[in-house]
Amino acid sequence: MEIIRGAPALSTFRVQKLMEACVSAALPVRQIYAEYVHLADLSELLKPTEREQLEKILTYGPAIEAHTPQGSLLFVTPRPGTISPWSSKATDIAHNCGLGKVKRLERGIAYYVESDTLTAEQQRTLQGLLHDRMVEVVLNDFAKADVLFKRTEPAPFKSVNVLAEGRRALEVANVEMGLALAEDEIDYLVENFVRLNRNPNDIELMMFAQANSEHCRHKIFNADWTIDGKAQPKSLFKMIKNTFEVTPDHVLSAYKDNAAVMEGSVAGRFFPDPNGVYSYHTEPMHVLMKVETHNHPTAISPYPGAATGSGGEIRDEGATGRGSKPKAGLTGFSVSNLKIPGFVQPWEGNYGKPDRIVSALDIMTEGPLGGAAFNNEFGRPALLGYFRTYEQEVSSHNGVEMRGYHKPIMLAGGLGNIREEHVQKGEITVGAKLIVLGGPAMNIGLGGGAASSMASGQSSEDLDFASVQRENPEMERRCQEVIDRCWQLGDKNPIQFIHDVGAGGLSNAFPELVNDGDRGGIFNLRNVPSDEPGMSPLEIWCNESQERYVLSVAAEDLPLFTAICERERAPFAVVGEAIQEQHLTLADSHFDNNPIDLPLEVLLGKAPKMSRNVVSAKAVSPALEQSQIDVKDAVKRVLSLPTVADKTFLITIGDRTVTGLVNRDQMVGPWQVPVADCAVTAASFDTYAGEAMSLGERTPLALLDFGASARMAVAESIMNIAGADIGSFKRIKLSANWMSAAGHPGEDAGLYEAVKAVGEELCPELSLTIPVGKDSMSMKTAWQQDGVNKTVTSPMSLVITAFGVVQDIRNTVTPELRSDKGETSLLLVDLGAGQNRLGGSCLAQVYGELGDVAPDLDDAALLRGFFETMQKLVANKLVIAYHDRSDGGLFTTLVEMAFAGNIGLDIDVEDLQGTDLERLFNEELGAVLQVSRDNAAKIAAQFAIAGVPCHVIGTLADDQCITIKDGAREIFSDTRVALRTVWSETTYRMQAMRDNPACALEEFKLKQDETDLGLTVNLSFDPSEDVAAPYILKGAAPKMAILREQGVNSHVEMAAAFDRAGFESRDVHMSDILSGRISLEEFQGLVACGGFSYGDVLGAGEGWAKSILFNERARNEFSRFFERDSSFALGVCNGCQMLSNLKEIIPGSEHWPRFVRNRSERFEARFSLVEVQQSPSLFFQGMAGSRMPIAVSHGEGHAEFASAQALALAEASGTIALRFVNGKGEIATQYPQNPNGSPNGLTGICTTDGRVTLMMPHPERVFRTVANSWHPDNWGEDSPWMRMFRNARVNLG
């Protein structure tokens, strides 16, 4: 084992945060220094030149001054017996650089701690701050790290002696293994194994437990129900299916696959043909939809819990039909009170929590980062979300009890597209190869399905930790590229049948695969790729290692499938073969036995059906006491409630522009305020048709009225999507995610009431279908604290996601108020018809109360009338701005619209009934519309004809004040900036705690700056002029290499941009160049695309660059290309980072910087303002002086020069092509206008001859006007960024 010292691991402010954590934990620590240490497992000693090469490969990241280590060593490494994602990718890079003697690279962090003598307890506390015990260990000596490379002998399976010891043996195994088997399931297993005359093996029991867990089988939703002694006619699932029976319109697949599918629009699907050339394929773009929850793992370990939640949902989408394409994602969180240090709110008590779960604050610090990071690295934009905090002592049908989300909701969902011929799964032919595609088996996530089916507190702490999985999104990206290549082959798609590997691992996935295909299977355990040779058969078969799919491929198609996987560097293995008989055999060649030998009907057959005999209950709660509440205090409290407050800290960490197909993300208007009601995507690059999705959830209402909570969730999802141009209810499909504390008194009957309200009544009445959903039935946390039994039980929680097919994405209306549209009026459409019920409202919550009566949708006809009227107005472009009324009531709706439009309001609520508090803070269904004053009366009349009350409530103000009156009496008045400051303080506090606090403060101050102009545009050219048109007419299209490496994710939109400019865009993978399949000699131009090559493990783009510099064939190819006078190249984002590391082979690049970690030390997804500089760049000719917004999505975009002198030389060279600026056109020096902290706002640079240009922002994602989060009204189809690509075509003549 070679030990190679690396760079410092922590920046100054990260060290400071760690020291603050030590102070909080009362640890006598004086100083901590941390640096990376690399470990190399070698097959033989390296020559001096090879050692030097390895050291160069392992030199990466920002330049931080190294120290001479002092103090005690705590060396944090991956857990022995595992291979970290970092290791597998870094080892890949070493091999691609020709270092075959390196068997494996691994990395740890050496912490040097200077302190007083620590007690054993203090040592444990300190180690807890420095490592994640789920996947890491702490060593006190570098030499001990050689245990990472030790191989252990496989362990055999164990049998449970049912034949001799009977039922008791299985009862003991049930507890020890955490199987969560019900009594009747134990009887079923004993009976079946006695009949088979053999003892069950541990692996068979775990497989049965996973396949039959509540998580996988949905026993409660399929159960028979008796309520208050009366047998109910339908199961919960039957009531959900009723929506499809009543309205099957436009549904192509429901209830039987990994996701549901609805009819989409016809568009030109853009992808490469088998020859690698990208082109449009006009066909139906059907829409798949899926929403999952990952609650249990997120409570235990939020980052990996949320990451693998998103990853698993993405796999569900990709494994729909015979393979499909995930497109856009959503994330949601419900947690208990945050209790932010130094910012604890008056309604936040201190009830406590069990040690084995983390706090709500931890969840909201780490969980969103995990979900965002997975989506970012996979390359799926995260466009939608919700965030609710709730933890309150309430009077319920069980007396006074604590309700809240100690067991959180972590929602992960999204939509994608699928080809018509692949919607239905194919036939698994006898003899077909049964394949696992993706990463290796690791001893993690054991029993996740069964564990998440228990109430938190029933399983042991170690089992809780064992049930969390780990993430490797770059591996999942590679697998998705394989699936993409397969579905792109149309009727030659080699995939017959595909499932993702989720709960239960292969033990659930392979039986499900063969059973769904009416086949059996013979499998070989030792063919499963494994990173931990010491695992037992149970651990290999049942672990929940992520990023895996199982599929069947006909034997004759195996060579084609193999070639695709090898090109994409996606690992796969043939594990078994399909057989006619529905029997499952798992052979173990190592021990020469069969750990599994079972008829499938025993595993998946007639396990006993559940019966629920329950009693209903009704809560009685007093009305909200209003007399002591001051309106000004209510405003401050409601705007500070995280459910209502600014959610920027959850949004800018997630890429919202990848794919180039995003029309509407969370951020709205020139000031990019996060208040959008729905997300909208384009179907493709050649159409205005698209897709929309929105969320609806009103969970606290369930504490008063289960049915109302469910109806309001459905209604809110419709109110949120109403601003998109959909047309008909029948083009909207819903996902329903149900969370409940099953078994808690009153909750089961309440769940039944809620499902019935939606499935049997509301949805059928509105022609709405629920073709997909998920349930999580153990939403309760129980523990003992100082001898006292404590519980926190969540409200019955229904989260609805609405998915719609959009007719014209240009018609989408946002909450941005416009002051440049002449005289306008604000209308309140009130579906609550003046009832003003305050039960379960945010107002009640912030005063520690629940209230008495919940708002409700009293008549479905109100919602139908509203939606149909609104859709006509949207299609005819009669609505200027739109925002629904929900959490925080009318007051919140109005101020959020004012924030988005950067303007004041004059509001008069004289026409509305009720007290001031009721009028401003009731959360009845409703919406505010900004319309032309000339049209206001006509529009109000249209709503009246539809049976929906509508009131004119005000206008835009001439100043920046928000004033609310009741006739002549003033109810409330304050400045927009003062209110924005209150609304944004929660996000500031969270950012300051999690990220660089200096950056967080700069952003908070910018929100308070009345002189901030937001995004502005100033162009030096006409974007509607196609300067490339004369050259395109000449005929032959020049060849453009669209270059990608494993983990790159922005290549399709890049190909589309160059295709539109008249190039022949060709898909080129680095494996094509390394293997000699393709030579760069063939191409006039090359573009290195954005993403996460090798997961950025050796610095962003650096691993990719080194695999070129240190590979003889690749180095020669690229050197020859750059030396050609006629060639040109563009590097964007990850491609920019990569090319900046190829300076030694690119002529004229001497002044280039490296691109390293952002100043905020956070991935930054922003819509930022840049100005084109005067430079020789061929891409920017004729564009100098132009100022316009552009998509930014990177974690390592800070331009780092070797010295101040090097920066001065770069400036003097005239090669700086692009800078971040503010709305006044001044160089942006402050965050977030300068999102990465680069000196002088530098974010683009070129060679001295202008042939090679690097830029961190993404022009390819915004080359269409509709793909810009905000744009001036007068832009046409092409945004100004299209000029860049056309300039490249002009340059070739």
Swiss-Prot record:
It is found in: Cytoplasm. Mg(2+) binds at residues 677, 716, 720, 884. It comes from the Bacteria. One of its GO terms (cellular component) is cytoplasm. Residues 1040-1293 form the Glutamine amidotransferase type-1 domain. The active site is at 1133 (nucleophile), 1258, 1260. It holds the Pfam family GATase_5. InterPro entries: Class_I_gatase-like, FGAR-AT_N, FGAR-AT_PurM_N-like, PurL_large, PurL_linker, PurM-like_C_dom, PurM-like_C_sf, PurM-like_N_sf. ATP binds at residues 305-316, 676, 886. Its EC number is 6.3.5.3. It catalyses: N(2)-formyl-N(1)-(5-phospho-beta-D-ribosyl)glycinamide + L-glutamine + ATP + H2O = 2-formamido-N(1)-(5-O-phospho-beta-D-ribosyl)acetamidine + L-glutamate + ADP + phosphate + H(+). GO terms for biological process: 'de novo' IMP biosynthetic process; purine nucleotide biosynthetic process. Keywords: ATP-binding, Cytoplasm, Glutamine amidotransferase, Ligase, Magnesium, Metal-binding, Nucleotide-binding, Purine biosynthesis. PROSITE patterns: GATASE_TYPE_1. GO terms for molecular function: ATP binding; metal ion binding; phosphoribosylformylglycinamidine synthase activity. Residues 305-327 are annotated as: Disordered. It is an enzyme of class 6 (ligase). Pathway: Purine metabolism; IMP biosynthesis via de novo pathway; 5-amino-1-(5-phospho-D-ribosyl)imidazole from N(2)-formyl-N(1)-(5-phospho-D-ribosyl)glycinamide: step 1/2. Monomer. In the N-terminal section; belongs to the FGAMS family. Phosphoribosylformylglycinamidine synthase involved in the purines biosynthetic pathway. Catalyzes the ATP-dependent conversion of formylglycinamide ribonucleotide (FGAR) and glutamine to yield formylglycinamidine ribonucleotide (FGAM) and glutamate. PANTHER family: PHOSPHORIBOSYLFORMYLGLYCINAMIDINE SYNTHASE. NCBIfam families: FGAM_synt, PRK05297.1. This is Phosphoribosylformylglycinamidine synthase.
